[in-house]
């Protein structure tokens, strides 16, 4: 029992380290499960299940949510183009960014900016 508890604490530390890493590097288009598993020297399946277990959300969903939240901030507080914002928040293409934005928020980037 003690060993399991210790392992969970280690898992929590890894999961929190992953959160910090994502928060600092959300703009990297290469940010992915594979990159994070490599960075933290753990397997992809372990990282995936650990993240879901500790945060109650899939890793890819968390990354997407962080990127969209940052984009919302840029849309409201800057005059940057949608293309530039999509690059800054880690999307390889403006189209995939716009689709993700609409999927997460329910409205388009231009509608959000006007609201």
In which residue ranges do the predicted regions lie?
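Generic hydrophobic, amphipathic alpha-helix propensity
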Residues: 14-18, 22, 63-68
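Terminal helix-turn-helix DNA-binding modules in bacterial transcription factors
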Residues: 53-92, 114-115
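Conserved phosphate/pyrophosphate-binding and hydrolysis machinery centered on Walker-type P-loop NTPases
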Residues: 8-12, 30-33, 40, 61
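Residues within well-formed alpha-helices
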Residues: 17, 70, 85-88, 104, ...
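Basic, amphipathic alpha-helical hairpins
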Residues: 1-6, 19-31, 51-55, 72-81, ...
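Append "Primarily bacterial transcriptional regulators
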Residues: 35-42, 47, 51, 85-92, ...
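The cytosolic transmitter module of two-component sensor histidine kinases
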Residues: 11-15, 82
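…primarily DNA-binding HTH/wHTH and HhH modules…
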Residues: 99-115
